[in-house]
Amino acid sequence: MKRNKTSKAWMHEHLNDTYVQRANAEGYRARAAYKLMEIDERDRLLRPGRVVVDLGAAPGSWCQVARQRVGSDGRVLALDILPMDPVPGVDFLQGDFTEDAVLAELESRLAGAAVDLVLSDMAPNLSGVATVDQARSIYLCELALDFARRHLKPGGQFLVKVFQGEGFMGFRKAMDEVFLSVQVRKPKASRDRSAEVYLLGVDLR
C-alpha cells in the first residue's frame, strides 16, 4: 500500500512538473533538456561547429539540445546502455560504457577527431542500497573523466552529473587535477531534494 501511495504521489508530481509540461509542449524527450540549456546559457558549452560526446544519452533530450546548438557544422556522438529512438544528425551507439569493446567502438566512430565537449548524465541501475549505488555512480563518473582526459582537445570542457555523498570530494579533486577550473552547477530543473549536481571542468590541462 505504501509503495502504491508513493508511486501515485510521484506520478502526480511528475505530471504537474513545469519542466515536464514544457518538454511535452516543446518537443523534448525529457525535462533534463532544461538542465543542459540552463548550464549552456551560463557557460556557453554548445557552440556552433563543436564536436560533442554525450554519455548516458537516453532518452535523448541532451542530444536534441546539443544537435540544435552545434549546428550543421557540428557533430554529436551519443552512447547509452539503453535503446534510444534516433535523433536526426546524432550518431548513436547502444552499449555498456564499462565494457572495453563498447569503448573501442565509440573511439572508432570518433576516427581520431578531437572532442570539444564531453557530457555525462550517466547513472547506474539502482540496487536500493545507498552505499552501493553511490559507489557505482562515482565509478561511472571516473570512467567518463578518463574518457574526457584522453579525447578532449586542449582547452576542452567536461560536464558530468555527480551525486553528493561518499566519494564526491575525491572525484572533485580528481577533476581539479585534469582541468584548470572546476565549477559546481545546480540548474533550476534539478529538483531541490535531489543530491545531484553537475561538475563542469573547463580548460583541459
From Swiss-Prot:
Coiled coil: none annotated. GO terms for molecular function: rRNA (uridine-2'-O-)-methyltransferase activity. It is found in: Cytoplasm. Keywords: Cytoplasm, Methyltransferase, rRNA processing, S-adenosyl-L-methionine, Transferase. Its main location: cytoplasm. Its EC number is 2.1.1.166. InterPro entries: RNA_methyltr_RlmE (IPR050082), RNA_MeTrfase_FtsJ_dom (IPR002877), rRNA-MeTfrase_E (IPR015507), SAM-dependent_MTases_sf (IPR029063). One of its GO terms (cellular component) is cytoplasm. S-adenosyl-L-methionine binds at G60, W62, D80, D96, D121. It catalyses: uridine(2552) in 23S rRNA + S-adenosyl-L-methionine = 2'-O-methyluridine(2552) in 23S rRNA + S-adenosyl-L-homocysteine + H(+). Belongs to the class I-like SAM-binding methyltransferase superfamily. RNA methyltransferase RlmE family. HAMAP family: RNA_methyltr_E. This is Ribosomal RNA large subunit methyltransferase E.
